[in-house]
Amino acid sequence: MIRFTRYLFVYEGEDGDARLRDSVSRQMKDLDKGIDYDFHAAADPEEALRHVSLYCDLHKDIDTCFVACGGDALTAAVAGGLMGAGEGKTLGVYDPSGTNSLAKYYEGMDFGSLAKLVDGTPAPIDMIRVNNSYAVNACVMGLESMVDGKGLTPSLSAVLKSSFRSVKITVDGVALDTGSVFLFTLANGKYAGGGLHCAPLALNNDGKMDLCVIRNMPPARLSKVLHALASGTLADEPAFAGDYTARRAKSVEVECAKDITLSLDGRPLIGKEFKARVVPSAVRLVVPAE
């Protein structure tokens, strides 16, 4: 059952990724359903957002699935371009590598099969709005020296290089007593960066964010706490209960005397004040058929 008039595959690369285009074209041809599809090679995630938003404005009457073919930053950008576009415009994810955080949220679902994408079902998901930017999965502060292309690497040397921040965090209007903060994660989904399992209990359709604040502590202990955070086991280890604060919230405000950097699904946002809130049922995502 074809649910959309057109599929637009969005990826990064000015000259195009020949292997991606060939793989998509081959799979769509094998489906033999006469599906209308096209490609857009975005220069970067911000250009992808602008293109998707403009496309929605110019083609209001064409039901379109915008398929993000890339990592978290590109996926969030495509989703951001769909804000306010209406039910006829839907987000899809093509993730043959299995590293996309949004795809990893749906355990057991095959986001590498276009046949299952075409037969999939759209479902509403929330997004996080931070100031004027959006995230699908998570916002993270404090991992600048600890994240590589494979996700979190909380080695002792990385911990020693990182600085602690005096940050004021307000959750649904109530200030948290957090003291000096090493990092915090604000999650809509379960993963950040494709590998950081920061919020194993989070739901991306419940109208709330999962906040975890890691306090300042001796480096050796901090390294252990971060390993537990990365593997999604922090809440299961009573010995670490006093090392972090966890809340579920509709809104979170962050203030700092000096500029800090938030990572919004891999896109940096720099400032001293941030206002984050959940946007319920912000976009629809095609969940692949089983």
What are these regions (language model features)?
Residues 144, 185-200, 268:
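Glycine-rich phosphate/pyrophosphate-binding beta-alpha loops
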Residues 11-14, 96, 214-216, 288:
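Cofactor-binding loop segments of dinucleotide-utilizing enzymes, especially the Rossmann-like FAD-
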